Amino acid sequence: SSAASDVYKRQLVCEVIDELDISGKTIAVEPVGCAVTAHNYFDFDVVQAAHGRAPAVATGIKRSLPDRVVFTYQGDGDLASIGTAETVHSAARGENITVIFINNTIYGMTGGQMAPTSLPGQVTQTSPYGRDPKIQGNPVRVCEMLATLDGPSYIARVSTDSVPHIKDAKRAIKKAFENQINGKGFSIVEVLSTCPTNWGMSPVEAMQRVRDEMIPYYPLGVFKDIEDVEEDK
């Protein structure tokens, strides 16, 4: 299921929090969507936000409790759709929060409808003949869009389809948390994920789809890192 495929991403987040020894001061903000039950897996404080509003809630918590480490954990149907305004403006302001963005190109919890990230030609409950860019528009590449802003400190897209990519994902997530600890501002890590149930695939087939279809459209890498800019000066 989508929720089951999401577990490993949560594990990476928890490993990073343990390694940084910050669980006692960490506050997570969970969305509406498959990650709405994230509090069952996190052994630290968790707040639930209204649909798409997690970055706004995280902003309020961080500004009122600046010594806490605050992060959101959101899917693409939450962050890239109803939450677009909150995502863009928290990034533009350079809010000192961390955003973990799980992109599986579909609305998982509500039964498999087309998301802003659904690929061209992708069959969903609301695009039964495949997404047609002429009718439903083109997918939103969140990292590339946010990288045009001055506010973010770190923007990366990763995947967990292979051991090397899992290691890269953990490094990116760790950096996103370290940036917040060091007061560097807004960081977002997009993690390409699967939803075997709503894709109508086996887990193995779904993982192959990530490699064959998602990564070519959503290339992995770092799209912005203020450390690179500082080193160039």
Q: Each PLM stretch: what is its role?
A:
Residues 9, 21-38:
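N-terminal glycine-rich anion-binding loops that anchor highly charged ligand groups
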Residues 30-108, 171-175:
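Thiamine diphosphate
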Residues 32-34, 104-106, 162, 190-198:
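Glycine-rich beta-alpha junction loops
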Residues 67, 115-182:
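Conserved thiamine diphosphate
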Residues 2, 181-233:
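Flexible, low-complexity linker and terminal segments
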Residues 45-47, 90, 115-119, 205-208:
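Short, hinge-like loop/turn segments at secondary-structure boundaries
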Residues 1-8:
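Short, small-residue-biased leader/transition segments that mark boundaries at the very start
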